Swiss-Prot record:
InterPro entries: Aldolase_TIM, Methyltransferase_A, RlmN_N, RNA_MTrfase_RlmN, rRNA_lsu_MTrfase_RlmN/Cfr, rSAM. This is Dual-specificity RNA methyltransferase RlmN. It holds the Pfam family Radical_SAM. The lineage of its organism: Bacteria, Pseudomonadati, Pseudomonadota, Alphaproteobacteria, Rhodospirillales. [4Fe-4S] cluster binds at C156, C160, C163. Specifically methylates position 2 of adenine 2503 in 23S rRNA and position 2 of adenine 37 in tRNAs. m2A2503 modification seems to play a crucial role in the proofreading step occurring at the peptidyl transferase center and thus would serve to optimize ribosomal fidelity.
């Protein structure tokens, strides 16, 4: 398959089928069925979505069209710097090229199924991809800027007991097109095209802390980060991208060597016996191995510290002894902590400790020389806070909707009818 076909909106339709000649020396066959007739007609391949293509792939696509190399830079500028979706508006491209692109390509974002806004300004989008699967993306505002929390998988395979996403089994990895598309859809919503300067942009940071484990989808995540970093396109600074992992030890080293982005580690316990219970991945990569990988992370220094995320769970990991064990555990790692009050979700079985307990925990870390802010919940009222993301499948939502109606319960959350293809253009 040619390189430029990798990120098509959908697989080409099946072109196999019987060959029927107009003349035959044998007996006359029976009339074609409707299905056979449709199969015998050649189908056009699905359009190529330019979002998610690398520079090399865009260059290959244009080369196959007979275009000169400089056109790749121009097209890159229109797609990733200006966010343009209409080929006719790409005025630096020749008219014949624009016509060819319009016939064979699209510049599409994921379809926005639902947008929710929190009282604190947090925004959450439920995005649908061409195959009907969905993921959530969250914008977290901070004064005049903010971070976009991006998902890397539909569902998650890790089943961390305190995380709502972990209750949704892994469906599949997101492609580079779908990861980059989340950011571009958010830019559409905020009108941040062309790419603004670092000082003026609202979507200033990207955190790969949404649904899924990024290091279990490394190739697609790495490709997406490369596109996001390119200073002639979306142009997000490397120091403003943070990748969060639950502790996939072998991939932590590779991430540091190849990507060099900020690293956050979902730690949540200082002792193996506790972490084994709340984070099953610890049974494969225990704390000693995880800390060794963190100490070796390229670029980690006092000026660029690893962030350890620590969800405070009442009676589980919030004691003074836990705080002291944490200090001993991270010795030799340039790091800081984010203490996260547990954000409840239906059926979790956990509780958040009283704030005074969390403050006491933070003070112990602070007195040992570590920065340990308490990260106050954002978007909790729309289930957009840390650990609350989950995108039920269309089938699950339809089943729940049917059950509610059968029980005579009013339901304002019926599954929306939407095309199983990306939505070209700006987000509504």
């Amino acid at each position: 398959m040619p390189l430029h076909r990798v990120e098509a909106l959908g697989e080409p339709q099946d072109r196999t089928g019987k060959t029927f000649s107009g003349r035959t020396n044998g007996p006359i066959s029976s009339p074609l069925t409707d299905t056979e007739r449709r199969m015998s007609i050649p189908q056009n391949p699905a359009p190529v979505n330019l979002v998610g293509l690398s520079r090399e792939e865009i260059a290959a696509l244009l080369r196959d069209m007979g275009e000169k190399p400089f056109r790749a830079k121009q097209l890159w500028h229109w797609v990733y710097h200006r966010g343009e979706t209409d080929f006719s508006a790409m005025t630096t491209l020749g008219t014949p090229l624009r016509a060819k692109l319009a016939e064979t390509c699209v510049v599409a974002r994921p379809h926005v199924v639902r947008e929710q806004r929190s009282e604190d300004g947090t925004r959450k989008w439920l995005l649908r991809f061409p195959d009907g699967n969905e993921a959530e993306t969250v914008y977290i505002p901070e004064d005049d800027r903010g971070a976009l929390c991006v998902s890397s998988q539909v569902g998650c395979t890790l089943t961390c007991r305190f995380c709502h996403t972990g209750t949704q089994l892994l469906v599949r990895n997101l492609t580079a097109h779908e990861i980059v598309g989340q950011f571009m859809a958010a830019r559409d919503a905020y009108g941040e095209w062309p790419s603004p300067t670092d000082e003026s942009r609202q979507l200033s940071n990207i955190v790969l802390m949404g649904m899924g484990e990024p290091l279990y989808n490394y190739d697609n995540v790495a490709k997406a980060i490369g596109i996001l970093l390119d200073n002639e396109g979306i142009a997000v600074s490397r120091r403003r991208i943070t990748l969060s992992t639950s502790g996939v030890v072998p991939m932590i080293r590779r991430c540091g060597a190849e990507l060099g982005v900020n690293l956050a580690v979902s730690l949540h316990a200082a002792r193996d016996e506790i972490r084994d219970e709340i984070m099953p991945i610890n049974r494969k990569y225990p704390l000693a191995e995880l800390m060794a990988a963190c100490r070796e992370y390229p670029g980690a220094s006092n000026a660029r510290r690893i962030t350890f995320e620590y969800v405070m769970l009442k009676g589980v990991n919030d004691s003074e002894a836990d705080a002291r064990a944490l200090i001993k555990l991270v010795e030799g790692v340039p790091c800081k902590f984010n203490l996260i009050p547990f954000n409840p979700w239906p059926g979790s079985g956990f509780e958040c400790p009283p704030i005074r307990h969390i403050e006491r925990f933070a003070n112990i870390l602070f007195e040992a020389g570590y920065t340990a802010p308490i990260r106050m919940p954002r978007g909790r009222d729309i289930l957009a806070a840390c650990g609350q993301l989950r995108s039920d499948s269309l089938r699950e939502r339809a089943s729940l909707h049917k059950a509610r109606l059968a029980a005579g319960v009013a339901d304002d959350h019926a599954p929306a009818a939407a095309p199983l293809a990306d939505t070209p253009g700006a987000v509504a």
